[in-house]
């Protein structure tokens, strides 16, 4: 699989998040015109929460779009929408947040619309995001927490090369119940053949 990346201003992602491209996908920061596609995506029953504690609506997603830009400028994290095809259809959302002040460790969430699961979109997206995190951001470790019952997502992370580190018992509240989550990790030194060059490291 051939993957190319375009990273304008990648040396300072806090000032401007670059656009990353691969054969199937283009990743860019959310903008106001993404409102309705994101409302639909985040309203899915199995959607990642991305910080939402209540059912999403237009107002909450508008606030989310503004908040992710603020989080990026302060260095707390960054968010990409995943688009695909000639029409640049919004088909997913990826967010990476720092878990320590120096961003040595980050946590990511990725959500794809059902029609794009199992198509290769996730693996291309993950390779771009992982390479950006380890290269431009300079992180050493990337974690992911996935509901144990989500076999497809856990299988995709395993295929990516992530290591399962344990089960977080009843650690996620969804609706009226608490779910177990699988803790996965990716390390910079293990990224190896998945690497996609996205520019120089941020110091």
Ranges and model annotations:
Residues 68-81:
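A short helix-loop-beta-strand connector motif used in the catalytic cores of GNAT acetyltransferases and
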Residues 14-16, 67-70:
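Short, P/G- and charge-enriched loop/turn segments at secondary-structure junctions
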Residues 1-45, 79-203:
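Acyl-donor (CoA/ACP) binding surface of acyl/acetyltransferases
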Residues 46-67:
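Conserved GNAT-fold acetyl-CoA-binding loop/helix
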